[in-house]
Regions:
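Terminal amphipathic alpha-helical/low-complexity segments used for targeting or macromolecular assembly
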Residues: 1-29, 85, 153-188
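Aromatic-residue hotspot detector
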Residues: 23, 35-36
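Arg/Lys-rich RNA-binding interfaces used to dock onto structured RNA substrates
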Residues: 29-35
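Flexible, glycine/small-residue-enriched loop-and-beta-strand segment within the central core
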Residues: 36-46, 51-127, 153, 160-162, ...
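A generic membrane alpha-helix/interface feature
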Residues: 93, 148, 170-172
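C-terminal/domain-terminus segments
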Residues: 121-151, 155
Length: 188
């Protein structure tokens, strides 16, 4: 299903289609920007306050679960399908109803508060812990513990997140700001 052709002036229609495709997207479960691609939709489960940026692909042959507050950057692929490693096992086999290739799927679970940055790929069978960051372009093939930053191909844990990572908004951005009333008068 592609929501690419559902323009902003059809916002209600887009939301109805999305809720039909992904029932957990109802009631604030997710904000999803088009285009969005998925295989089935019914195997995708959103917690509250999830955000999915544009051009994401969710191949949901098995369940994909995003807990509360998960952010997914642009062009991310979350793919549950897996294929055999050996080439002769990947070849289509003849069955009574025709030729088929061997494919199986493993679920993916992403913990609350995690952020999957742009162009990352999450492979089947992976569990990403709570409050994790998956760096842009990373390919996650193994489980990620809570409160970690992972990056690379394949993704590896760079370090644990801690209190020193907390953004100091006042010190960083507001310290040298001039109050609005003085700025309007042109004074510093």
């Amino acid at each position: 299903m592609c929501l690419d052709r559902c323009f902003l002036w059809r916002k209600k229609r887009k939301q109805r289609l999305l809720e039909k495709l992904i029932p957990s997207a109802k009631d604030g479960g997710a904000a999803i920007f088009a285009p969005f691609y998925c295989e089935y939709g019914v195997n995708i489960h959103f917690g509250k306050g999830c955000f999915v940026n544009y051009k994401c692909t969710f191949l949901d042959c098995a369940p994909i679960t995003l807990e509360d507050g998960v952010w997914v950057g642009a062009n991310v692929t979350i793919a549950t399908p897996c294929h055999p490693f050996l080439s002769d096992e990947r070849l289509p086999q003849q069955y009574p109803d025709g030729f088929h290739d061997l494919e199986y799927a493993k679920p993916i679970h992403i913990g609350s508060g995690s952020w999957i940055c742009s162009s990352a790929t999450i492979c089947g069978g992976v569990t990403i812990g709570k409050n994790c960051i998956v760096a842009a372009g990373a390919v996650v093939t193994r489980d990620v513990p809570d409160n970690c930053i992972v990056a690379g191909v394949p993704a590896k844990v760079l370090r644990k997140l801690d209190e020193q990572d907390r953004m100091q908004v006042w010190d960083t951005y507001m310290k040298n700001e001039v109050p609005m009333s003085e700025r309007e008068r042109g004074r510093k």
